[in-house]
Amino acid sequence: MKKLLIHTICLLSALTTSTAVAAPFTAGITALNRQHDATAFRAWKRIADLGDAEGQNNIAYLYERGMGVKQSYQNAKIWYELAAAQGLPEAKHNLAMLTYQGHINGRDTRKSVEWFREAADAGLIQSVYMLGVLYMEGEGVFKNYDKAFEQFIHAAKRGDARAQYMVGAIYAEGFIDPADEPDYAKAFLWSGLAVLGGGEQAQSLKIAASVYLEKDQEKQIVEQAAQCLKTNFEICE
């Protein structure tokens, strides 16, 4: 199986709640873009202390990375938990990543599954993808390739390039059912969509799949990919 790509932590760059904290939130984004990490931390700490979930998530991100403040997974956990308690999906995803990567009292994949599932249920595609990874690997859940594919295809149809790559890889290897033959046409389609979405790692898979296709098949699939994008993936399987 192709190497699984892992989604990293989520930093919020757009405010979704009260405009009362918009100025310091935006100031933090501007500072971070200019690599003024300590200034970003101070700006977000102000609104985090006022209970703003986005600010809490973002200073947790800085603690986790050691950007503008001394690196501390424990402090990152505290602030992520405060934001997650307010229902912020990104904070739940980030807590899941901390536990998945073993940064909080050892690796706890079952707890990761809980956080990823909550964030995925709230619509966070990064978490949908990560549930696919966990089902594929059998981490925190029983290994189940069908469920892994369900998560990957769902995220792929929402435009996630990593998920599109994984869908292509699964089709290329006939991974769902050992009795199935590889479907190189679908592998070419989804890896091509991943490349269009910025997933450079999918280029090698696209090339490998193309070896098994005729030129007229490739042309038809390229046209199908265009229709997939035009219809927001409604016609893609």
Indicate residue ranges for each PLM-predicted region.
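Terminal, low-structured helical/coil segments at or just beyond the last alpha-helical repeat
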Residues: L196-E237
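Canonical positions in the second alpha-helix
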Residues: W44-I47, L82-A83, E118-A119, H154-A155, ...
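N-terminal leader/linker segments that initiate helical-solenoid repeat arrays
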Residues: T17-N58, E234-E237
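Short helix-capping/linker turns of helical repeat alpha-solenoids
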Residues: H36, D49-A53, R65-M67, S72, ...
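Structural signature of tandem alpha-helical TPR/SEL1-like repeats
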Residues: Q35-R42, K70-W79, N105-W115, F142-Q151, ...
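Bacterial N-terminal signal peptides
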Residues: H7-T16
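Positively charged n-region of N-terminal signal peptides that target proteins for export
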Residues: M1-L4
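Hydrophobic face of amphipathic alpha-helices that form TPR/SEL1-like repeat modules
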Residues: P24-A31, N58-R65, N94-Q101, N105, ...
